[in-house]
Amino acid sequence: MIVLVDGHKHHYEMECLTMMFFPGEKITTTTDLSQQDGDYLYTRLREGEGIGQLFVRASVGGTSAEEGMEIPLDAPDYDRQCERGFGRMVYRLLSAATGRAPKWGILTGIRPIKLFHQCVADGMTEEEIRQLFTQEMLLSPGKLDLAIQTQKNEQKVLSRSTRDSFSLYISIPFC
């Protein structure tokens, strides 16, 4: 599978997300747009006239599908919105093409609970968090419930921390 990146810097996120749909396969990321043979994922960002235009085409097994969306250039967190917009489109297209639906949605390369803690710190309600993570991040209901419960349990522990406390994160691969 080739991931073609055109006009944006989200190559790492696109590659990681693509790997979830093609486990064990070699994923090559390139800006060489001539490599649209065989299976590929083409992602493009064009900016102009106050709008960022995102476009994704997935060609898998001889069948192609595409999606696009627009984001105002002055949108809050424009870069993050582009990253997540690309992620949602890639997820939907590759899910339809492969029949896979990764339960953690578009979340790659980050501990999900870290995002949940940030949402709580920003004053979001549990309902707002649920909406964000199901609609924007495409988490499955089971993983969403697990993450919310984990965040609540972790917050109980963190609330007892003192100034001289520290956190130790141990990465345990589970792929």
Residue ranges and their predicted role:
Residues 1-96, 100-103:
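A short, structured N-terminal alpha-helical element that caps or precedes a catalytic domain
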Residues 175:
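Conserved, mostly hydrophobic/aromatic
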Residues 98-101, 121-168:
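N-terminal [4Fe-4S]-dependent radical SAM core
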